[in-house]
């Protein structure tokens, strides 16, 4: 028997195993680099920028083509530890990485997910804040803010009121990152409550603020996404697990209904980055003891995986001219779901629209031409981890040079301030709301 090989075989699982401890910057970097080295065919590790103190903002990409976008494969992301003292999400994402890479080729569900999705994972958006926590606390610790004492979840441009704060390096890095990828779906992991919160976080009368809520044109989809996560977390779905705190029916809330906030990241993603993002509050205690981490992983594992799958909801495709040339930067939206910042095709002419099962009219608009309408019917179940594929051929030859490369209709100003007080686009009908709830129930 070859004893050195035997000992090496026994040792490798121990080296590769990720423990349930809090990983500071050095330990987190070591783990991420080891994963990137050992699973180089399905991972790509890169930094999107640096914190105020010069710490790298690491992102690990997991996918069959991790280093670049492939047409038809949607981009998904998880971001955690935006508040440095909210720590559970940071560790859950490290364990999610470990689970994904070690399950590839063994678990058919995970293998299919990696084949069909490009998954971006940022364990810590605020590494300076995490390192600043000297005494972990359930309620508040120095470290929530970044090194310059800015709350990063109040630091983004706001669509409802002017947010004249100094944009921080971590925020700027994320904003630039969002421009480099065609993100479709995202979640932002926090702590201090147990709830899945969906946009809007801020609001005006036109979005329902008079009714203590602020709803997007895609409210049915957002409610479905939030319920998808919460319903698979045994404690979150109770809605009242955190004592002496607000109760959340079924573990879900509209952000504005909970409490309004200015400059939040999930609203910025939805309005300016064409990315549906919700906020996940994962623990009643912001910085729980390490021995609690295994139970947090067990309670969130199924939710984390199922939520990634939702990037395949709805319809996707490319827009072509009559000669088969893809058309970038053209408006592609669903009739009666107009976004205040119109959603546009990427440089490959691709579009991704998250939609629940049903019948919809897609409206494609190119400057100088009549709108092109296409009817689609979204089936009850996505096929093989893929949204319905619907390419759209426009009956003219595209003049690519005349199509703007940026979106002039979407300056980073309070776009909603100029809306009329009552906008049908931002108030989903009661029928649509009930249909979405029935869909969630039967799912």
UniProtKB/Swiss-Prot annotation:
Residues annotated as domain Peptidase M14: 21-311
EC number, as in UniProt: 3.4.17.12
Keyword Kinase attached: no
Required co-factors: Zn(2+)
Membrane topology category: Lipid-anchor; GPI-anchor
Keyword set, alphabetical order: Carboxypeptidase, Cell membrane, Disulfide bond, Glycoprotein, GPI-anchor, Hydrolase, Lipoprotein, Membrane, Metal-binding, Metalloprotease, Protease, Signal, Zinc
Chemical reaction(s) catalysed: Cleavage of C-terminal arginine or lysine residues from polypeptides
Cofactor info, note text: Binds 1 zinc ion per subunit.
Binding positions for Zn(2+) per the UniProt entry: 83, 86, 190
Matching Pfam families: Peptidase_M14
Active-site residues, Swiss-Prot/TrEMBL: 281 (proton donor/acceptor)
Signal peptide (from-to): 1-17
PROSITE patterns assigned: CARBOXYPEPT_ZN_1 (PS00132), CARBOXYPEPT_ZN_2 (PS00133), PEPTIDASE_M14 (PS52035)
Domain of life from the UniProt record: Eukaryota
GO molecular function, one term: zinc ion binding
Propeptide: 424-443
Residues with lipidation of kind GPI-anchor amidated serine: 423
Subcellular location: Cell membrane
Annotated Gene Ontology cellular component terms: extracellular space; plasma membrane; side of membrane
UniProt main location, coarse: membrane
GO biological process: one example: peptide metabolic process
Similarity comment text for this entry: Belongs to the peptidase M14 family.
Record-linked PANTHER family: CARBOXYPEPTIDASE M, PROTEASE M14 CARBOXYPEPTIDASE
Annotated protein name in UniProt: Carboxypeptidase M
Organism: Pongo abelii (Sumatran orangutan)
């Amino acid at each position: 028997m070859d004893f050195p090989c035997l000992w090496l075989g026994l040792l490798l699982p121990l080296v590769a195993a990720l423990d349930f401890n809090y990983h500071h910057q050095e330990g987190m970097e070591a783990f991420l680099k080891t994963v990137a080295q050992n699973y180089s065919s399905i991972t790509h590790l890169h930094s999107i920028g640096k914190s105020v103190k010069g710490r790298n903002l690491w992102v690990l990409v997991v996918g069959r083509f991790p280093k670049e976008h492939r047409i038809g494969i949607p981009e998904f992301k998880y971001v955690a530890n935006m508040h440095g003292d909210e720590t559970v999400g940071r560790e859950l994402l490290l364990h999610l990485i470990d689970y994904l890479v070690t399950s590839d080729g063994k678990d058919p569900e995970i293998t299919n997910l990696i084949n069909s999705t490009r998954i971006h994972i940022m364990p810590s958006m605020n590494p300076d804040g995490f390192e600043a926590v000297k005494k972990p606390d359930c309620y508040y610790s120095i470290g929530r803010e970044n090194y310059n004492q800015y709350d990063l979840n109040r630091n983004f441009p706001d669509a409802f009121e002017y947010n004249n704060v100094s944009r921080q390096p971590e925020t700027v890095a994320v904003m630039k990152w969002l421009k480099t990828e065609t993100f479709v779906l995202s979640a932002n992991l926090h702590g201090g409550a147990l709830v899945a919160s969906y946009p809007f976080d801020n609001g005006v009368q036109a979005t329902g603020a008079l009714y203590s809520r602020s709803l997007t044109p895609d409210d049915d989809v957002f409610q479905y996404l939030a319920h998808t996560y919460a319903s698979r977390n045994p404690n979150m779905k109770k809605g009242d697990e955190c004592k002496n705190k607000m109760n959340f029916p079924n573990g879900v809330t509209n952000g504005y209904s909970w409490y309004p906030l200015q400059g939040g990241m999930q609203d910025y993603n939805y309005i300016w980055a064409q990315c549906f993002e919700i906020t996940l509050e994962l623990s009643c205690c912001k910085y729980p003891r390490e021995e609690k981490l295994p139970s947090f992983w067990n309670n969130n594992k199924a939710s984390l995986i199922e939520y990634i799958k939702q990037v395949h909801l709805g319809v996707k495709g490319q827009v072509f001219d009559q000669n088969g040339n893809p058309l970038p930067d053209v408006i592609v939206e669903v009739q009666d779901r107009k976004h205040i910042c119109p959603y546009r095709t990427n440089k490959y002419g691709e579009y991704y629209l998250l939609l629940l099962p049903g019948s919809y009219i897609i409206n494609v608009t190119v400057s100088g031409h009549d709108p092109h309408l296409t009817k689609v019917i979204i089936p009850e179940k996505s096929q093989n981890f893929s949204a319905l594929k619907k390419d759209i051929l426009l009956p003219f030859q595209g003049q690519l040079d005349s199509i703007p490369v940026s979106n002039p209709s979407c300056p980073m100003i309070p776009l909603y301030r100029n809306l009329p007080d009552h906008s049908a686009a931002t108030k989903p009908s009661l029928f649509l709301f009930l249909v979405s709830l029935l869909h969630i129930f039967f799912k």
